[in-house]
Amino acid sequence: MKLYKIILSVGFWLLTTQLTSAQENNFMPYDQAILGSPLSFKMVPIQGGEFTIGSAANEKGRNADEGPQKKLSISAFWMSAYEVTRDELDIFLKDESTSLNVSVDAITRPSPQYVDLSLGMGKQGGYPANSMSQRTAIMYCKWLYQKTKIFYRLPTEAEWEYACKAGTNTAYFFGNNAADLDTYAWYEKNSENTFHKVGKKLANPWGLYDMIGNMTEWTLDHYDATAFEKINNEQLLIAANDAKYPKTLKGGSFIDPAIELRSAKRFHSDPIWNRRDPQIPKSKWWLTEAKQVGIRLVRPFLEPTEEEIKQFFKAYLNL
């Protein structure tokens, strides 16, 4: 199993950076227009800081892979206020200026879905994009970079959990009482087995909607059940991994019970998510058994160089 050593560097990833006054003035919420369309998406600033990743040993529903808890330092970034919608993703899917080949250096447009993987739950008007592979999610980020000249990517697991917890240490960002979930999340009990338009529940304390429930969200990380045991010096080092499975997801979804929506809960991808795909070889782009999987974007405050961005996409799309 090969690890691509692009260990995520200072300012680019997880080392805390104190922002200057001038930088603070530029670290504001903004709306990112998607060129060639009337659509935009909102980005929320997330200040850097320290937090404790994982769950307490006595947290109800805790799994062994959520520990041991470790303190991490996180650098500043923006995160999308909402999950990426199908309306937004469709602009990429229908962009005929992109390639249909599989070159790593090209912006490669995913092949069409074999069947409608929204399964009648909703596509236009603010419904979340679903059933895409991690590769599709990262290629969408590469396409956005081409269109906007701004580097967007998936969050690391640590960034995601830091943003979800929003300064809290409880099972959920609103406390420990799962009875309050209806206010913040679509999950097994209230979803009627369908995903819902983004942003219809209350946001977490940092202004992020649907962080728990609705869609389980991809992160960059390869899943390792013992990852937290390997954290040293308050840093979680991430490298691109050429194994297709398993990758880490966070947040729980509309099909999950309340206990699965805890901030520290970890999910991982599984080959059975493509079990019903009739194509040979099976699609790199779509997951026939993962109707609950979606994405959310981040943008590091300190922009990496053009060469670093090139190496990032080369590593993560050469899987």
Question: In which residue ranges do the predicted regions lie?
Answer:
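Bacterial N-terminal signal peptides
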Residues: S9-T17
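Short loop/turn microsegments at loop-to-beta-strand junctions
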Residues: K42, I150-F151, A203-W206
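Bacterial N-terminal signal peptides that target proteins for export
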Residues: M1-L8
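Disulfide-stabilized, aromatic/cysteine-rich ligand-recognition loop
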Residues: Q23-E24, M28, L202-N204, E234-L319
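Active-site microenvironments of metalloenzymes and redox enzymes
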Residues: I53-K60, S73-F174, D221-F228, R299-L319
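Short, well-ordered junction/capping motifs at the entry into regular secondary structure
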Residues: A185-I212, A240-A243
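Short, polar loop/linker segments at the starts of domains and inter-domain junctions
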Residues: S55-I74, F195-K201, L261-P278
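Mature N-terminal segment immediately following signal peptide/propeptide cleavage
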Residues: L39-I53
